[in-house]
């Protein structure tokens, strides 16, 4: 078994004006267990950043901390700063529902509501008091077009979301998330339940979406990270080991552990 120097780090930074999001000294605890260990990380606007690493390394925990989803876990505690538009959204006085409007989440498995395709998109808007049908129709069409689903469902908007394929359901969930106009999309292994064709379609959708959104994606699929991201970050045991342009991570990693992980020789 290879002995690695875990003090070895290579982490890029960006000019302040290009930042969509950043964390400073971010720690996440589940009870007494420290799952994320003081991560400083920056995300560039309108780029796709992939978070990779072995199971249990903390990448999903880190992702869920960015829009305060860990607040839903009783034993979770998050310290440090999560900086969005210069504001620390980890402050206890922040409205987490407002935060999640700006940092939308797409989960591992498609989770459409038990409603029509149309109502999946309009549900949050109607609850917020939007009643004008023309406005709602426009939100639905715009969101589904951005998620590359409109042409497939425009004649079936009032059918159940459960009539869609797995890949279509995931793109519906993306459409639902972007309908509230977030700046950032957080995706936790969004292709793990999809077949290769649906995965390819999802990646093509991501390429289009990054024109308007910043995307942060957790993936176990090295090929997907290499294909679909601009930047890649390697996590291990709650630490950020290496963070660089994706081509550098896969072709010229600075840390031996990173190189071994992406080449399948880790351990």
From Swiss-Prot:
Q: Which domain of life is it from?
A: Bacteria
Per UniProt, the keywords (alphabetical) are: ATP-binding, Cell membrane, Membrane, Nucleotide-binding, Phosphate transport, Translocase, Transport
**The keyword Transport is annotated on this UniProt entry:** yes
Pfam families reported in the protein's UniProt record: ABC_tran
Q: Give the membrane topology.
A: Peripheral membrane protein
Q: Which Gene3D superfamilies match?
A: P-loop containing nucleotide triphosphate hydrolases
Residue span, ABC transporter domain:
21-262
- Provide the reaction this enzyme catalyses: phosphate(out) + ATP + H2O = ADP + 2 phosphate(in) + H(+)
| Annotated CDD domains | ABC_PstB_phosphate_transporter
According to its UniProt record, where is this protein located? Cell membrane
Supply the InterPro entries for this chain.
AAA+_ATPase (IPR003593), ABC_transporter-like_ATP-bd (IPR003439), ABC_transporter-like_CS (IPR017871), P-loop_NTPase (IPR027417), PstB-like (IPR005670)
What is the protein name for this chain? Phosphate import ATP-binding protein PstB 2
* Class of this enzyme: translocase
Q: How does it assemble?
A: The complex is composed of two ATP-binding proteins (PstB), two transmembrane proteins (PstC and PstA) and a solute-binding protein (PstS).
Give a short account of what the protein does.
Part of the ABC transporter complex PstSACB involved in phosphate import. Responsible for energy coupling to the transport system.
């Amino acid at each position: 078994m290879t002995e690695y120097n875990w003090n070895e780090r290579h982490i890029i930074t960006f000019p302040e004006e290009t930042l969509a999001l950043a964390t400073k000294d971010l720690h996440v605890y589940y009870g007494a267990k420290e799952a994320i260990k003081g991560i400083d990380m920056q995300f560039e606007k309108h780029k796709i950043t992939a978070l990779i690493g072995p199971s249990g390394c903390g990448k999903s925990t880190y992702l869920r901390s960015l829009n305060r989803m860990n607040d839903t876990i009783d034993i979770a505690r998050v310290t440090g700063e999560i900086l969005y538009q210069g504001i620390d959204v980890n402050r206890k006085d922040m409205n987490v529902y407002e935060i999640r409007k700006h940092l939308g989440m797409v989960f591992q498995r498609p989770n459409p509501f038990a409603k029509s395709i149309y109502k999946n998109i309009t549900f949050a808007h109607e609850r917020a008091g939007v009643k004008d049908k023309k406005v709602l129709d426009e939100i639905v069409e715009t969101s589904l077009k951005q998620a590359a689903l409109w042409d497939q469902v425009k004649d079936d908007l009032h059918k159940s979301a459960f009539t869609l394929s797995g890949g279509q359901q995931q793109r519906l969930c993306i459409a639902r998330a972007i309908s509230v106009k977030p700046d950032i999309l957080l995706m936790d292994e969004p292709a793990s339940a999809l077949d290769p064709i649906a995965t390819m379609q999802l990646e093509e959708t991501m390429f289009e979406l990054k024109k308007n959104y910043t995307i942060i994606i957790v993936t176990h699929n090295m090929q997907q990270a290499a294909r679909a991201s601009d930047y890649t970050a390697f996590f291990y045991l709650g630490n950020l080991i290496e963070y660089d342009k994706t081509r550098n991570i896969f072709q010229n990693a600075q840390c031996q552990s990173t190189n071994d992980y992406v080449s399948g020789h880790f351990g």
